[in-house]
Amino acid sequence: MGATAATVGTAAASTGDGTLTVEVLRDFFGTGLINTTMDVPQRGMKVQVTDPAGHKVTGTTDATGKVLVPPSTELTGGQYRVDVTIPAPYNKHLRAAPAATGKNHFDSFTTFVDVSDGKDDSVITGVWNPADYALPDSRYFVPIQNTADGKDTRALVAFGTDKRGTCPGDAACPTALNTQDQVGTTFALAYDKYQKRVFQGAFARRYTPYGPEGGDAIYTTPTDGGSAPTLFAKVPGATVTPHDATNMIKDAGFTNAPGKESIGGMALSEDGSTLYAVNLLTRRLVSFDATGATASAPKATVRIPDPGCANPGDWRPFGLQVHDNKLYVGGVCSAESTQQREDLKAVVYAYDGERFDTVLTQPLTAKRGSVFGSNDVEQATHWNPWNTSLATWDERKVGNVFIDPQPELASLAFTRDGSMVLGFRDRFMDVVSWGGLDPRPDNDAPENGMAGGDINMACATPTGEYEWEGTGNCPNHATPATGGGQDASVAEYFPGDFFGNGVHAETALGSVAYIPQQQWVVSTEFDPTVNVATSGTGYHNVTTGQGPGNAPAANAYQFVSREQSGFGKAGGLGDIAYEAANAPIQIGNRVWFDGDHNGIQDPEGRNEVPLPDATINLLDADGKQVATTTTDAAGEYYFGGVGAAYELKPGAKYTVQFDVCTADTSEVPTQPAATKLRFTLPRAGDNRAHDSNVTPPKTGRLCDGQAPVTAPDKPGEVDHTIDAGVYIHKAKPPTPTPTPTPSSSEPPSHEPPASEPPNHPGPQSGGGSGTGGGSGTGGESGTGGGSGSGGGGGSLANTGTSGLLKIISLSALLAGAGAAAAFVTRKRRAGQH
């Protein structure tokens, strides 16, 4: 799909101009620098281009993230101001990304270009969702499940995202954060970056008990390991079936409870205010106030609608994930009522707090890799209807091993481009075990099960829909060389979840997670490093799909040994969460020479130029200097952001000191000494993205001014509206001495004044809806910038001068039109993007 031309109707730039390209990328790193391999195009962003006369053209970025402004007649002059804003609904989750002054950096949301005389120019700016941010040394959290007589006492472990290999052995073992005695058997996790704790939900699995607070319990554990877990809340009415505590190795009456009772997935809202959980028994979404140490009761309970299963009782919601300020709910139609494979399907809803919208429906009828052995055994190579009937119990076997993969959509993750990774758990492995006893009366034979979960991809399309792996433009990466010996007809985006060639072609255990700054999707797996009857994590390349089966030493981490685990190849791990972080904040932007002294950042020209080498100091609330920098060739500066020497404190009071006495004035008309610069009109116009923040000082060094600033109070937000405009003050001429009245009778002559009155234009009208001041960033409705429409739409249109002076100024502009090539423009983008 091609880039969209900016339009007012079909308008574009002057016929003598080159082509302007405005590109918006979604950033995930917050350094202010473009990452050419991981940043992705962002559609739907509003772009406005304004010429010196106030004429405007607008456009919206397309699927490539671009707006093209070709030559036309709507704009004149060749030098323009470009403003980018984030419209609804994107402004609910996207913010302006941090910018920088280094090589290959993102431009600010307000940028100045020169396409005069056929030159091409470009702007590349960034947006991001700060909720995506994680530190390079982030950790994963994974629950460990064990049988009642198992040797592993760990219930929650944490380990670095770089861990590979076998523990113990050639890799360090993870840190245990709590124990089986403290929380029992759990699955769901949600990490709280605001309070640095993990929520952990009880889980129904045969042969292994609930924790001390029962099957409806949600626990919290500090991630520093400094204290024991505590009960956070209970999900009302989540369980009815008790374990057989006197004979847990058989647990005969619990065969039908897994997947139908206790707690399914959990997710925390991006602002940390709400914890969501799925009540598997009632099929309801339960939400809790997550801001306190405990929650005495849910704040809301909502029915998750049946998507049209063969029978309403077949609907089994489970997985939860928050992405871009929406909650996604995954589940399956289990086909339990019909026992017909064609009734199996996966469904994903998007929930905005009011309604559930179906975003994915996928039949689960296709052939898969074999759980064990031959590719010709249908039961081992397909998903099967849910069934735990004791009357047909022996039909769950393939040979002497229980193999009957029954799908649960247990987890969801989203990649950088919005594609959806789905983790399917084999529900039957929560019914059987590895060495547990037959549930039927008078039969105590030990039984072994082999898990057959999966990891699948639904690729996002440019129109916001999804395509299943192997269809449309969503690749099938399975080949004889990568697929682990599975049948050639099997299509998989992630074919690397296998053990050996032709042994186990589906080793995924159903939990997935994805950190956007990394290149792999992590999945729970059995036998990840080729050691038998073990558990750990596999790492799947998000581009190629290759995983632990393709290179176990490089793509897997084993941390549950055969000796530790009572679940063996049935799998003994729960969900995966990662340690997200609060993204740093940033302030700053631009110092410019305001030749017309109107206080508005007009398109650059001979009288509107950036001011390099101005010294910018950041002072804290006590007046102490905490950071310093100088403006670059574009007049820009920034404090904060990822990797900055000084990390701004959210919501703190600061003062930005603009010492323009050091500025380079070589491009300023008449090249005055920097000490002659004075600050322009402050807070002019209605658009805080285009004004100057400094109230001109009246004493001391008049080229050294200050602007008070309150730093953004939410993680990852930026305020690129802290600007300073300067001009050269022209002294008023002295009042001439009155001419004595002649003594003759001749009438007195009326000489014209010695000079024109000084031109001090008033504030211009127009502007967007951002607040904060300066050449800014932000969404249409947010603080911290955003240019909106209007905003100093041309210095000629609203100068506040007399009609005569307007004509004089317009004549001067027309006379200088042919000298446009002499205007100073910002060249830095051309060689750096």
Where are these regions (language model features)?
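C-terminal segment of classical bacterial N-terminal signal peptides
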Residues: 2-10
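A short, Gly/Thr-enriched small/hydrophobic beta-strand-prone motif that recurs across taxa
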Residues: 14-34, 582-602, 615, 721-730
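Short, acidic Ser/Thr/Gly-rich low-complexity loop/linker segments typical of extracellular
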Residues: 32-34, 53-71, 597-605, 622-642
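Hydrophobic beta-strand segments
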Residues: 45-50, 614-618
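A short, solvent-exposed loop/turn motif at the edges and junctions
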Residues: 54-55, 74-112, 644-708, 727
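Extracellular Ser/Thr-rich, low-complexity/disordered mucin-like segments
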Residues: 760-810
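C-terminal membrane-anchoring or membrane-association module
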Residues: 805-833
